[in-house]
Amino acid sequence: MRILISNDDGVTAPGIAALHAALADHAECVVIAPDQDKSGAGSSLTLDRPLHPQTLANGFISLNGTPTDCVHLGLNGLLEHTPDMVVSGINLGANLGDDVLYSGTVAAALEGRFLGGTSLAFSLLSRLPDNLPTAAYIARRLVEAQSRLELPPRTVLNINIPNLPLEHIRGIQLTRLGHRARAAAPTKVVNPRGKEGYWIAVAGDAEDGGPGTDFHAVMQGYVSITPLQLDRTFNDAFERFDGWLEGVL
């Protein structure tokens, strides 16, 4: 099996090194990741300049682009052999609920949908790497197990891992996405020349984080697995349009 590994924390981040080390003796792994932190890049592509891959001393490929750029190039000619699956992470920080809309970690896995199989995105609920060994072990076990799982084509598994030692992980739960409350207001700053700017505030707290959600699972010490799909069509809203379009044109 050939696995393409990417992330949004950057090619030198400890999470991607831990993920590669965990999977390298299970599959043929290649790493293509951004040359700098691209957290919050979502599914953006770089269209205003060329992308320049650079192979580092450890064999990882660094790219001056987004996580989606990395996987896009990896699936479309940069590599000699097309990967069989995409695995993203290990992100230092949660990707729960609405986070999946902005997450470069999840976006990298979503770009892997063109392979037709299942892609996986891993996140650890900590900005510190202390429990990366836990996350790496769980990532390996789930990558090994996913071949036995029959899912619809182009499914992405969004996996969040509590910031705990392995012996304190209570198990794994299948969850739905929760929802966050609105974020706080941006922080206004003024540079020495008097020019105003803003720092985006941190994500809001869980507004819908009850039992069954990804928020609830990880807070209870469980690994959360949420199956995602690209189709965001709001099918239940269709009936509300009955008669509304008549006479619009």
From Swiss-Prot:
The EC number(s) this enzyme carries: 3.1.3.5
Keywords tagged on the record: Cytoplasm, Hydrolase, Metal-binding, Nucleotide-binding
Single GO molecular function: 3'-nucleotidase activity
Known cofactor(s): a divalent metal cation
Binding annotation for a divalent metal cation: D8, D9, S39, N91
Keyword tRNA processing among UniProt keywords: no
Name listed for the protein in its UniProt record: 5'-nucleotidase SurE
Gene of this entry: surE
